[in-house]
Amino acid sequence: MGVDPARIEEAALNALQTQRQMFFDGWLLRLSPGKAKRARSVNPHFGSSLPLDGKIDRCERLYGASGLPTLFRVTPFAKPPDLDAALERRGYVAFDNTLVQVATSGARRAGRRDPGVHLHEVGIAAFVDAVAALRGSPAVQRDAHLERLAHSPLATHAIVARADGRPVACGQMSFDGEFAGIYDMVTAAAWRGRGAATAIVDALLAHAHACGAANVFLQVNDDNPAALAVYRKFGFVTAYTYHYRARPTECA
């Protein structure tokens, strides 16, 4: 599609900003107590000058002091290039292999959905409440999610699918120039395969197209065949992949 993966990564980092983050010798350390690992992990994207082992030690101390596991998000843009191997030597294991996929906003697909499901455009607080209800999130994760979205510098468009007044699926989109990113796609187990997620993606793509965002990206675990099947309908293809590394007892 001719889309620069580095630009997608930049837009994704912009959308997942948190009030609790700092730079350390070119690494972006995010320290949110929320559910999203992208907002509570080390993102090593910039040049580095300090000895690598000492930097990792410092990260472990900082995350430990914050009551968080030390997670490293390893992308094709990670620096130094031997970081992944260095973490493996220290006993860090790789997990949550994630596909970053991209499609054009014109890739619409009107699908059939349960007639009892209705889509609603909602504000940030209502959206976060719906996500928390669908995930069964504890209050600390719900509050961190609200903090992150409420203070985002990017415009957000959120949709909740409801049946009998209850949320059954949701998804939101953040805008960054010619890019729009889809996040927080969640569907209640009893409603999977009934068209709710497809309808939300279709509506989000329509909104992106109307707003002039030509390219839409999302991130999905490679072991989620149901979600991959939905995204495939809209022509999403993988631009690059990333994974996390953590101690075996902290892979969460």
Per-segment meaning from a language model:
Residues 66-76, 208-219:
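Conserved GNAT acetyl-CoA-binding A-motif
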Residues 144-186:
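A conserved beta-strand-loop-helix scaffold within acyl/acetyltransferase catalytic domains
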Residues 52-60, 184-189, 193-210, 229-233:
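Conserved acetyl-CoA-binding loop-helix of GNAT-fold acetyltransferases
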Residues 74-81, 218-228, 245-251:
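Conserved beta-strand-loop-alpha-helix junction that forms the acyl-donor binding cleft
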Residues 1-7, 98-100, 107-145, 162, ...:
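Short amphipathic alpha-helix that is part of the acyltransferase structural core
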Residues 1-65, 79, 140:
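N-terminal charged segments
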Residues 21-25, 76, 82-93, 155-171:
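Conserved beta-hairpin
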Residues 50-125, 245-246:
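Acyl-donor-binding surface of acyltransferase catalytic domains
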